[in-house]
Curated annotation (Swiss-Prot):
UniProt keyword S-adenosyl-L-methionine present: no
Binding site for Zn(2+): 55, 57, 203, 292
Catalytic activity: 5'-deoxyadenosine + H2O + H(+) = 5'-deoxyinosine + NH4(+); S-adenosyl-L-homocysteine + H2O + H(+) = S-inosyl-L-homocysteine + NH4(+); S-methyl-5'-thioadenosine + H2O + H(+) = S-methyl-5'-thioinosine + NH4(+); adenosine + H2O + H(+) = inosine + NH4(+)
Further facts: SAH is a product of SAM methyltransferases and is known to be a feedback inhibitor of these enzymes. As a result of this inhibition, organisms have evolved efficient enzymes to metabolize SAH via different pathways. The pathway found in methanogens differs from the canonical pathway, it uses the deamination of S-adenosyl-L-homocysteine to form S-inosyl-L-homocysteine for the regeneration of SAM from S-adenosyl-L-homocysteine. 5'-deoxyadenosine is a radical SAM enzyme reaction product which strongly inhibits radical SAM enzymes.
Pfam family, one: Amidohydro_1
Official protein name in the record: 5'-deoxyadenosine deaminase
Organism: Methanocaldococcus jannaschii (strain ATCC 43067 / DSM 2661 / JAL-1 / JCM 10045 / NBRC 100440)
Length: 420
């Protein structure tokens, strides 16, 4: 049992009582309710829901700064994919731990990941105390033999993650994109998603080049093509990027309840474009936030994404009223929880105890009149305490689950292997 005393939460000073992995009570907590509770002093602190990053490639912390200032296809073909060919479980494990440290320190408690060597990722997630949805990244390049291997691996990893019996680690399916995956693979992904009741995590409409490739091959835009053979039917889908969209595609997204992972910083850095977020919001489409991998961002600080998502669309639409501060904050909290189907993203009784505490005695958080504005437009992301699944993962700036110095040392060692 954990008691956070006298913390600013949901607009006023209150106590938060945590029992097991859930929030038991918000309000005044009596002494008889907290026998043997660990007490955290919430004085001068605000409690916010843990942030939810809906599109990552976590081990790519080791690719940070490797290939900057390049277009997506050149970035992938000439730099990223050749380095990824050298990956193994150990490299992925240490890269993931490095990412978990970075996310915990910047208030992220849950992430939705697509990558390889999931045993290493799952081990790191388990040790760090984070919550994650993990998908094996599937690419068959329209080759039948490779397709069978990818589908076999995807199913193997779903069963592996389920066998861990860890409620913090959940499986998903991760077909990379329609320009790297065959129709046959994508159709089978839909079947597997229904069979195992897991979400689909996919890249869609990230660049004009990608859309052109799909149109040349199929005669249709990506969402229209996928919808033509029922890819979105009866499944929960998280579509990363969604930068260039036709009105017909947006109509499909609304009909099929597509969850969008908006990655504004990665899309800007790779010059992919700007997603039409105000248009998607007007249609009632669930918009969430992702950082993408560190190779294209180059960090995992979701507070930066919140700020950029709030200001970017004001600028490109010449309208200061679009994507208001609270709306942008919700992208990274309650909207992310909805996309991943977890009872989190809000500090409410009965919800998962994924809570972040921020010391308000910082110059950029004064005056204390409009804290939501400060969190979105002024905060740098350095949080003080992190609770995930009812466990204290970081206290007063010290991570309790991971040996940070060892991770930093091993990260350099793993990077040298990748660059050799």
């Amino acid at each position: 049992m954990i008691l956070i005393k006298n913390v600013f939460v949901n607009g006023k000073r209150q106590d938060i009582l945590i029992e097991g992995n859930k929030i038991k009570k918000i309000g005044e907590v009596k002494k008889e309710e907290i026998e043997n509770a660990e007490i955290i002093d919430g004085k001068n602190k605000i409690a916010i829901p843990g942030l939810i990053n809906t599109h990552t490639h976590i081990p790519m912390t080791l690719f940070r700064g490797v290939a900057d200032d390049l277009p997506l296809m050149e970035w992938l073909n000439n730099y990223i994919w050749p380095m990824e060919a050298k990956l193994n479980e150990e490299i992925v494990y240490w890269g993931t731990l490095l990412g978990c440290i970075e996310m915990i320190r910047s208030g992220t408690t849950t992430f939705n990941d697509m990558y390889f060597f999931l045993e290493g990722i799952a081990k790191a997630v388990d040790e760090s105390g984070m919550r994650a949805v993990l998908a094996y990244g599937m690419i068959d390049l329209f080759d039948e033999e490779r397709r069978e291997r990818e589908l076999k691996n995807a199913e193997k990893y779903i069963n592996y993650i389920n066998s861990l019996n860890n409620s913090r680690i959940m499986p998903a399916l991760g077909p990379h994109a329609p320009y790297t995956c065959s129709k046959e693979l994508l159709m089978e992904v839909n079947n597997l998603a229904k069979k195992y009741n897991v979400p689909i995590h996919i890249h869609l409409n990230e660049t004009l080049d990608e859309i052109k490739m799909v149109k040349e091959k199929t005669g249709m835009e990506p969402f229209i093509y996928l919808n033509s053979f029922g890819f979105f039917d009866d499944v929960r889908a998280i579509a990363a990027h969604c930068v260039h969209l036709t009105d017909e595609e947006i109509k499909i997204m609304k009909q099929k309840n597509i969850n969008v992972s908006h990655n504004p910083i990665s899309n800007l850095k790779l010059a992919s474009g700007v997603a039409p977020i105000p248009k998607l919001l007007a249609e009632g489409i669930n918009v969430t936030l992702g950082t993408d991998g560190c190779g294209s961002n180059n960090n995992l600080n979701l507070f930066e994404e919140i700020k950029v998502s709030a200001i970017l669309h004001k600028g490109v639409n010449l309208n200061p009223t679009v994507v208001k501060a609270e709306e942008a904050f919700n992208f990274a909290t309650k909207n992310g929880a909805k996309a991943l189907n977890i009872k989190a993203g809000e500090i409410r009784e009965g919800y998962l105890a994924d809570i972040v505490l921020i010391n308000l005695d910082k110059p950029y958080l004064y005056p204390k009149e409009n804290i939501m504005s400060h969190l979105v437009y002024a905060f740098n992301g350095f949080v003080d305490d992190v609770i995930i699944d009812g466990n204290i993962v970081m206290r007063d700036g010290e991570i309790l689950t991971v040996d940070e110095e060892k991770v930093y040392e091993k990260a350099e060692e793993m990077y040298e292997i990748l660059r050799s």
